[in-house]
């Protein structure tokens, strides 16, 4: 009888192999100061964790304020304190140390430097995004490009450089890459609709007080606009209930804890970013990951945990 059990065990191990660490999804979110704030990426994380395939996934926000994919920086950026950082200065470290299986990248807002359309700037953005995708895929990671959000959505009459139209061109190019097999999540149409609806209900609603950085409700709008495409690419249900209140506060605090730890671990050249804890001291995924939506799921998250946010 004992020998029979011994013979059966190898067969069972073949039929039901143990899950290796490599099978756990490892998601890297890249971008500028808007995703760095943590709100919409943390909402996206909460949506992913509501699905069994991503409940215990590693999800880290590597976004960095001021950053571009193009490598461009306007003269006197940040009053001359430092040039804009470029994701390509630190991408190799992220890919080699974190080893993502999926990269979600949202660039463009800084790449045109808030200037009128320039063919040279546009080409630098195109090359930067193409290079980013190629590097991610060469590291065996899937790649999802997210279009840049809106500029001066509350006061378009003040957009003298017609920069939102420049971002339309950048987004249009990304959408055109779908014909080449790119996975692209276009937030701009859904975001525009939500802002328009919010202003119809409340003429005093402000999406982004400075024209660039959304408030908490704006981040929720971005998450709602990005989620359907990301869910489709990952074969997840399109419906999602985003958390709010204390449930979201816990997710955001943990999200930012992991963000700063991994930014410190992989390195960057951007001044003003708080140092993170050593990654060895980060909590285990199941201990901090909440997947429960609050009683008013979908309401705008409360303005918490953004004390480490820095401008573009």
Where are these regions (language model features)?
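A short helix->loop->beta-strand "cap" motif at the edges of active sites that frequently abuts
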Residues: 137-142, 182
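Sec-dependent signal peptide recognition
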Residues: 2-11
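Substrate-gating cap/lid alpha-helix
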Residues: 153-189
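Hydrophobic h-region of N-terminal signal peptides that target proteins for export
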Residues: 11-19
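Conserved catalytic region of serine esterases and O-acyltransferases that act on ester linkages
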Residues: 53, 180, 200-312
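Solvent-exposed loop/turn segments at secondary-structure junctions
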Residues: 33-36, 64-70, 102, 108-114, ...
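Extracytoplasmic/secreted envelope proteins and their assembly/folding machinery
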Residues: 41, 45, 88, 92, ...
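Serine-esterase "nucleophile elbow" of acetyl-processing enzymes
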Residues: 20-66, 70-73, 80-81, 91-99, ...
């Amino acid at each position: 009888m004992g020998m029979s059990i011994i013979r059966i065990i190898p067969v069972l191990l073949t039929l039901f192999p143990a899950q290796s660490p490599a099978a756990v999804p490892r998601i890297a979110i890249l971008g500028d100061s808007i995703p760095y704030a943590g709100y919409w990426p943390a909402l996206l994380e909460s949506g992913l964790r509501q699905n069994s395939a991503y409940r215990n996934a590693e999800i880290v926000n590597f976004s960095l304020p001021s950053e571009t994919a193009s490598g461009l920086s306007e003269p006197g950026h940040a009053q001359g304190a430092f040039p804009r950082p470029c994701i390509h200065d630190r991408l190799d470290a992220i890919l080699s140390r974190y080893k993502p299986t999926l990269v979600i990248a949202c660039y463009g807002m800084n790449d045109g430097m808030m200037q009128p359309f320039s063919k040279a700037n546009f080409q630098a953005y195109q090359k930067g995004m193409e290079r980013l995708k190629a590097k991610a895929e060469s590291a065996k990671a899937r790649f999802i490009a997210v279009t840049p959000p809106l500029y001066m959505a509350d006061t378009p009459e003040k957009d003298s450089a017609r920069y939102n139209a420049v971002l339309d061109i950048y987004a249009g190019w990304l959408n055109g890459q779908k014909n080449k097999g790119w996975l692209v999540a276009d937030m701009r149409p859904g975001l525009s609709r939500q802002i328009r609806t919010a202003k119809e209900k409340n003429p005093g609603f402000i999406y982004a007080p400075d024209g660039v950085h959304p408030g908490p409700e704006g981040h929720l709008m971005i998450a709602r606009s990005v989620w359907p495409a990301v869910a489709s690419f990952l074969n997840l249900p399109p419906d999602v209930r985003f958390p709010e209140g204390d449930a979201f506060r816990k997710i955001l605090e943990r999200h930012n804890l992991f963000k700063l730890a991994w930014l410190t671990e992989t390195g960057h050249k951007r001044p003003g970013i708080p140092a993170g804890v050593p990654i060895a001291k980060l909590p285990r995924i199941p201990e901090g990951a909440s997947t429960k939506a609050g009683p008013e799921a979908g309401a705008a998250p409360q303005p918490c945990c953004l004390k480490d946010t820095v401008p573009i």
